[in-house]
């Protein structure tokens, strides 16, 4: 008798631990889902940035066709591009790679690209280089530095979404427990005939037999 009772308790403990493991996995899955959604946005933002860069090169190309590029008008376009945006700096180079003009943050290109090994700020920067096309080949190049750092408000939104998903999982678990206890209260079902339970030897009457007895 004691051995059967011990088996029953072990069986129940294994089921409870298995359910708790599944619950933890689901809650971690909710966190992974939110983070994966955030990661999927990065390629989309990069594609939008490249589309913007191509559009800017079309506007700059007429200013680069003369022997002396119009630095003032090119700089005006770059200033408008970098003003209050996620584009930290922008620069235009000739076909030989020499700088013509730039706008935005006054950070050295070597420091921006972390060529000297200082990567403190470069982790959140992304470089985009787009050629400025002419009739006979590239007239120059446009370089943009994007700020890919996640703002505090965006990170908070991701955390809120994760917490909402976890709360929904916990509510689903609570509803399942309440429904199970309500529907099966005082009622023996066929799962109770498991060889690990003490009631396994007692047959479960069919529903029709119960109705006839009543």
Swiss-Prot record:
Protein name: Protein Smp
Keyword Signal: yes
Compartment list: Cell membrane
Transmembrane segments: 164-184
Keyword field: Cell membrane, Membrane, Signal, Transmembrane, Transmembrane helix
Record's signal peptide: 1-30
A Gene Ontology term for the protein's cellular component: plasma membrane
Keyword Membrane: yes
Main subcellular location of this protein, as a coarse class: membrane
Gene (UniProt): smp
Alphabetical list of Pfam families matching this protein: SMP_2
Annotated family: Belongs to the Smp family.
Topology of the protein relative to the lipid bilayer: Single-pass membrane protein
């Amino acid at each position: 008798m004691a051995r059967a009772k011990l088996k029953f308790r072990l069986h129940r403990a294994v089921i409870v631990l298995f359910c708790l493991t599944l619950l933890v996995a689901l809650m971690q899955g909710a966190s992974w889902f939110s983070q994966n959604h955030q990661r999927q946005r990065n390629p989309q933002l990069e594609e939008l940035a490249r589309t913007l860069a191509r559009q800017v090169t079309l506007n700059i190309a007429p200013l680069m066709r003369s022997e002396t590029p119009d630095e003032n008008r090119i700089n005006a376009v770059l200033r408008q591009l970098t003003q209050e945006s996620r584009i930290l700096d922008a620069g235009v180079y000739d076909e030989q790679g020499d700088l013509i003009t730039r706008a935005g943050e006054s950070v050295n290109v070597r420091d921006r690209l972390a060529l000297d090994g200082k990567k403190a700020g470069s982790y959140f920067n992304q470089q985009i280089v787009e050629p400025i096309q002419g009739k006979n080949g590239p007239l120059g190049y446009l370089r943009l530095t994007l700020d890919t750092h996640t703002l505090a408000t965006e990170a908070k939104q991701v955390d809120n979404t994760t917490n909402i998903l976890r709360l929904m999982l916990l509510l689903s678990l609570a509803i399942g427990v309440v429904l199970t206890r309500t529907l099966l209260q005082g009622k023996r079902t066929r799962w109770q005939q498991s060889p690990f339970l003490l009631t396994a030897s007692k047959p479960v009457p069919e529903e029709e037999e119960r109705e006839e007895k009543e």
